[in-house]
Amino acid sequence: QSGGRVASDIRAQRRQVGIIFQQFNLVGRLPVLTNVLTGLAAELPLWRAVLNRFKTEEQARALDALDAMGLGEQAFQRASTLSGGQQQRAAIARTLVQGARLLLADEPVASLDPESTRRVMELLLALNQERGLTLIVSLHHVSLAQHYCERVVALREGVLVFDGPTSALTP
């Protein structure tokens, strides 16, 4: 909004926000690359998005995002063949292709094993530190927040109980 009015470039504004869900929201029968390319859907003509018609440069962008997530070799596999951690990394790659500057991550590691959790959290941290992306992450494990986050906003039954630097949290 601007002065109480919806901004004229609202679609461009929406593309700046990527969402990473607890459930990965990948289409299992489609290749990982195609799933990642769906991050471009908002900027493509409808017919191209529906028919999965992507330009070479768009595919290169998606392959770069998959490489950044350590999934370059899995690009042409069906998404259903990936482990949970790999699926979450593919979902993160989808937001990178989208060009998001703000990532909202809703319990991104809730259903992952400890090693996959570590890897996903380290990738999210790297996106923040190396690419300057802003991250808002919902977590239920305080230890993860203490290890990977600079600031914590804690709620209990919908009431704010803490808002400050991670260093101010006590175990």
Segments (PLM) and residue ranges:
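ABC ATPase NBD coupling module
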Residues: Q1-G18, R48-T56
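Conserved ABC ATPase "signature" region
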Residues: L44, A49-Q74
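Conserved ABC ATPase signature
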Residues: R78-L82, Q86
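Catalytic Walker B motif of ABC-type/P-loop ATPase nucleotide-binding domains
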Residues: L103-D106
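Helix N-cap at the start of a conserved alpha-helix in ABC-type nucleotide-binding domains
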Residues: P114-S116
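Helical segment within the ABC ATPase nucleotide-binding domain
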Residues: R118-R131
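H-loop/switch region of ABC-family ATPase nucleotide-binding domains
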Residues: L139-H140
